[in-house]
Design a protein with these regions (language model features):
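Short, contiguous alpha-helical
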Residues: 6-53, 89-157, 161-172
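A short, structured beta-strand-centered segment in the mid-to-C-terminal lobe
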Residues: 55-70
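Exposed alpha-helical structural elements
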Residues: 33-34, 62, 73
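Residues that form generic nucleotide/phosphate-binding pockets
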Residues: 37, 66, 77
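Proline-centered turn/helix-capping motifs that create local helix->coil transitions or kinks
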Residues: 42, 76-86
Length: 172
């Protein structure tokens, strides 16, 4: 993630109103929401996953420190609580009552999908070869989307500008 140039962090991504900075935050906010729910019984809501940047993340170092803190927190949780937890227990989240296994799985593939997007952005938009390449075997057993970008056409466009473009070639 540190390979994204600081000058590009606030550039808006193709096809959606989110910057590189917001995407990086979102990647780590997803497991933070999971951990907060698991450890503190904080409600697991759609709004919590909107990943609105907090004011405390003033610069890139704050963002990278946040990411490292979440990574270490997750590793500690897994070592101390997670690996022995009964993930078949029910979890009540914004999309219904599911098992903790399903919530953890969704956390993994959701953040993983956004990591795939960062890798694609580095290569295709920033012309940077990622120092660490994501191997698809990392996601073995996870229900990863087939497309890295939700709409491959939108990825080839310029940054999202908030305007809906009509395709005049489609007639009713």
């Amino acid at each position: 993630l540190k390979q994204i140039p600081v000058s590009k962090l606030d550039v808006i991504l193709p096809g959606r109103p989110r910057s590189y900075r917001q995407l990086i935050y979102h990647i780590f906010n997803i497991p933070e929401v999971f951990l907060n729910y698991f450890q503190n019984n904080t409600p697991y809501t759609y709004e919590a996953l909107l990943s609105i940047l907090p004011n405390k993340l003033k610069d890139e170092n704050d963002l990278y420190d946040y990411a490292e803190d979440i990574k270490l927190r997750f590793e500690s949780w897994w070592s101390n609580e997670g690996k022995n937890f009964d993930f078949s227990k029910p979890a009540n989240v914004y999309y219904g009552e599911v098992s903790f296994h399903e919530v953890l799985e969704r956390t993994a593939w959701h953040s993983g999908q956004h990591c795939r997007q960062v890798e694609l952005l580095l290569k295709e938009k920033l012309n940077i070869i990622p120092k660490i390449a994501l191997n698809e075997s990392l996601f073995y057993g996870l229900p990863m989307p087939s497309n890295i970008w939700d709409n491959e056409r939108s990825f080839s466009e310029n940054s999202y500008d908030g305007q809906v473009k009509e395709d005049l070639s489609i007639k009713e």
